[in-house]
Amino acid sequence: MDSEVLRDGRILDLIDDAWREDKLPYEDVTIPLNELPEPEQDNGGATESVKEQEMKWADLALQYLHENISSSGS
């Protein structure tokens, strides 16, 4: 059945006691401002960073829409 998980045990070789006990350091990490999410989450709940929001425009090629309208109008 699709809802049943088949376990073959291969992942057990990847995890050992040293890996399980390994901890990340507690230090401040510098994050660029364009990678941070919007500080005001009350305006729609978008959790994308500024960079991710800019990438959406590029993914849809909407930045060329303005260029095409202004060049065809001349």
Swiss-Prot record:
Single GO BP term: protein K11-linked ubiquitination
This protein's pathway: Protein modification; protein ubiquitination
Domain of life, per lineage: Eukaryota
Major location category of this protein: nucleus
InterPro entries tied to this protein: Apc13 (IPR008401)
Subcellular location: Nucleus
Entry's Gene Ontology cellular component terms: anaphase-promoting complex
Keywords from the UniProt entry: Cell cycle, Cell division, Mitosis, Nucleus, Ubl conjugation pathway
Pfam families assigned to the protein according to its UniProt record, in alphabetical order: Apc13p (PF05839)
Homology family: Belongs to the APC13 family.
Subunit structure: The APC/C is composed of at least 12 subunits.
Functional note: Component of the anaphase promoting complex/cyclosome (APC/C), a cell cycle-regulated E3 ubiquitin ligase that controls progression through mitosis and the G1 phase of the cell cycle. The APC/C complex acts by mediating ubiquitination and subsequent degradation of target proteins: it mainly mediates the formation of 'Lys-11'-linked polyubiquitin chains and, to a lower extent, the formation of 'Lys-48'- and 'Lys-63'-linked polyubiquitin chains. The APC/C complex catalyzes assembly of branched 'Lys-11'-/'Lys-48'-linked branched ubiquitin chains on target proteins.
PANTHER family xrefs: ANAPHASE-PROMOTING COMPLEX SUBUNIT 13
Protein name: Anaphase-promoting complex subunit 13
Organism this protein belongs to: Xenopus tropicalis (Western clawed frog)
Source organism phylogeny: Eukaryota, Metazoa, Chordata, Craniata, Vertebrata
